[in-house]
């Protein structure tokens, strides 16, 4: 499902096509060199701001991405149904900040959760509960 490009993982094709249709020229939101180095030690081969997990607990691999498009950042989750993905915008376009990054949260919630962190500031989590996404302050 995930594609390796020169040892770097990229989003599944269906996710890339969906992102292309919403914002031609999008890219995974770049991060500071310090954050990139930290992410590389935790998850070699995975780029910053591409996050796989089972966010709704159905056993399928879902995907969250923090993208940069036309100078704005947007957080989008893609829930897998086994044959495709449903797109859900979690955070509408806002000013892009290279100190913002995603990380996977396990064991704190019923299912995997999306952590949205700001370097040296803190952050929040997006948790899928009762059929909908909820933002939780951490």
Model segments located where?
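Primarily EF-hand calcium-binding motifs
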Residues: 48-50
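Structural motif
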Residues: 71-77, 122-126
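Short edge-strand/loop segments of extracellular domains
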Residues: 80-84
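Acidic, small-residue rich beta-repeat scaffolds with periodic aromatic anchors
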Residues: 1-25, 86-138
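Extracellular/luminal recognition modules and glycoprotein regions
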Residues: 44-45
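Calcium-coordinating acidic loop motifs
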Residues: 54-56, 60, 69
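Transition segment at domain starts
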Residues: 20-41
């Amino acid at each position: 499902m995930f594609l390796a490009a020169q040892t770097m993982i990229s989003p599944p094709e269906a996710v890339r096509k969906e992102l292309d249709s919403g914002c031609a020229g999008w890219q995974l939101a770049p991060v500071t060199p310090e954050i990139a180095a930290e992410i590389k030690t935790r998850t070699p081969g995975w780029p910053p701001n591409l996050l796989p997990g089972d966010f709704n607990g159905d056993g399928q691999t879902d995907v969250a991405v923090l993208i940069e498009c036309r100078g704005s950042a947007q957080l989008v989750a893609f829930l897998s149904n086994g044959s495709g993905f449903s797109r859900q915008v979690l955070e509408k376009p806002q000013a892009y900040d290279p100190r913002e990054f995603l990380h996977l949260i396990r064991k704190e919630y019923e299912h995997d959760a999306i952590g949205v962190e700001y370097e040296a500031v803190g952050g929040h989590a997006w948790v899928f509960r009762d059929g909908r996404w909820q933002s939780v302050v951490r």
